[in-house]
Regions:
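Sparse recognition of residues in long alpha-helices and their boundaries
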Residues: 24, 64-65, 90
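Divalent metal-dependent phosphate-bond-processing catalytic cores, especially two-metal-ion Mg2+/Mn2+ enzymes
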Residues: 1-21, 32, 81-175
Length: 175
């Protein structure tokens, strides 16, 4: 998890340098964004917000308004969120928390199906994988990238090409 937080921090700083934001806030948000995983995976984003609001050390460096902005940013960072992050800080951490690696995404989608839908046969898993990839990653999918400078822009385009090429997608699915 520490390595993940470092990667999110690096990617956050890369995105943030293009915008008028407070770099120290960006760094703190990246460091705190997943701390709520220690409490509960499903609501970790909300737990992370609570942790920020309750951390007395942050009050030494940030105003109450900045702390609230940081808490909201971590609450808004989930890729599956159904609403746009409330601030540029939320968009930065949401974007930086994504590491779009096309084949890994496909493999994780298949694995999730195997773990959570054991009753499906191979064709059922194929259809579930297709549905999920189209719903989330294809053109018009709910995954939103917020910054043109993000390395994810290129990676998402590569994933979309694979999704459009069902023969190639099927080969990856079959691995």
């Amino acid at each position: 998890r520490e390595e993940h937080a470092q990667l999110v921090s690096i990617q956050s700083q890369e995105i943030a340098k293009h915008y008028p934001v407070i770099q120290e806030m960006v760094y703190a948000i990246a460091a705190f964004h997943d701390l709520g995983l220690e409490v509960d995976r499903k609501t970790h984003h909300l737990e992370s917000g609570r942790i920020i609001r309750e951390d007395p050390r942050l009050r030494e460096w940030f105003s109450q308004e900045e702390i609230e902005t940081m808490a909201q940013a971590v609450e808004d960072h989930r890729a599956s969120s159904d609403h746009e992050p409330r601030s540029i800080y939320g968009k930065i951490v949401a974007e930086a928390d994504r590491f779009i690696e096309p084949e890994k995404i496909i493999e994780r989608t298949v694995q999730y199906g195997l773990d959570h839908y054991p009753e499906l046969d191979k064709d059922g898993h194929w259809r579930r994988t297709l549905d999920h990839l189209h719903e989330k990653y294809a053109e018009g999918g709910y995954l939103k990238l917020w910054f043109p400078e993000s390395p994810n822009v290129e990676r998402l385009e590569a994933l979309r090409k694979i999704i459009k090429d069902e023969t190639r997608l099927r080969r990856i699915f079959e691995k």
